């Protein structure tokens, strides 16, 4: 993927370059006929992880999943993607990966391996990736888990409804929330 294409996927909040076709959460108008756009990075990351998990749930191996998502016919460095995802997730390319919270870290690392190619030179906060993985696993398993990101001020980018407030103002309110206070409507 070129730097120009990667920048477009980031602008679309679709860093995994998931193709149109599903009614994804947070869809907005896209500048592409092939790839959708979402309203937030979280919704785009969530969709990308759901797309990965859908292939894994069908019994595909790590290698087969990447070959489907990033085929060589699209001029993708599929072999290099498989090797990196294999190394990062510590899952062999010929192994299947069960979709469950028990495999949270492996699933997360598998996706991060793909993102190194799909969205090079762009790093999302760990808290955002964790929330996207959690939501995707919940979606595919139907099992709710404890929240990974409880503090919405750590979202990326921070919600526009948050107003920076000094520590003194926060302490006066009786609750300390760090650099961000409770949401205030603009």
Where in this protein do the model-derived segments appear?
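Cell-wall polysaccharide-cleaving catalytic domain and substrate-binding groove, primarily
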Residues: 1-186
């Amino acid at each position: 993927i070129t730097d120009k294409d990667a920048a477009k996927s980031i602008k679309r909040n679709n860093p995994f370059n998931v193709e149109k076709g599903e009614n994804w959460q947070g869809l907005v108008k896209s500048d592409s006929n092939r790839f959708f756009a979402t309203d937030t990075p979280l919704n785009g990351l969530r969709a990308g992880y759901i797309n990965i998990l859908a292939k894994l749930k069908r019994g595909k191996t790590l290698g087969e999943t990447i070959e489907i998502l990033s085929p060589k016919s699209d001029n993708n460095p599929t072999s290099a993607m498989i090797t990196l995802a294999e190394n990062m997730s510590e899952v062999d390319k010929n192994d299947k990966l069960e979709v469950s919270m028990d495999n949270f870290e492996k699933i997360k690392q598998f996706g991060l391996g793909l993102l190194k190619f799909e969205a090079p030179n762009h790093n999302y906060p760990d808290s955002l990736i964790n929330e996207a993985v959690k939501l995707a696993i919940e979606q595919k398993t139907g099992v709710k888990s404890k929240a990974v990101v409880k503090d919405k001020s750590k979202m990326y980018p921070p919600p526009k409804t948050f107003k920076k407030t000094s520590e003194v103002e926060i302490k006066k309110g009786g609750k300390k929330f760090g650099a961000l206070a409770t949401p205030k409507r603009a």
